[in-house]
Amino acid sequence: MNKIEEKKRQERAEHLLEKCREVLRSEKIPVSEGIIGLKINDGIRSRFGSCRKVQGVKKMNPEFEIEISGRMMNADDRAIETVLLHELIHTCHGCMNHGKRWRQYAMRLNQKYGYEIKATSGYKAFGLEDPGSREQVRYRIVCVNCGMEFTRKRRCPIVVNTDRYRCGKCGGRLEIR
């Protein structure tokens, strides 16, 4: 990606962040004014975004850094807004986890604006391809009794020592196919 594309991507993300902050303010949700940066991280593999409290900052006026996955930038604006709102809610006092207050704020936005802000979401929810779906299934473990199938992408204890395990559904013997 060249510098011009990176700049456009960053500008888009910052524009959407500001739009989300306005939505939160209009709903009287006490979003922090101490957001010091929005970073697009192409290395994130296991999440869509994060909100980090900057260390060493006073407790009265904490500062936060918001990070969004580079993959999310391939989604539509609505999906990006959903992730940014999720992270912005974390900047509210008492909302660093997905506790009661966080859920109340998310529910309020979901009901009024039709967002789908959740504690966790999958790639399908945002119309993105799951990067893990490209990996081939290397092991198929099948119950001889009921036919239940388990798949594994990596060599693991159940693959190495299949005879030590039983089917969780019926207790039958397992075999690799």
Task: Enumerate the language-model features and the residues they cover.
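Active-site-proximal or metal-binding-adjacent scaffold patches in catalytic folds
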Residues: 1-82, 91-177
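Walker B catalytic acidic pair
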Residues: 87
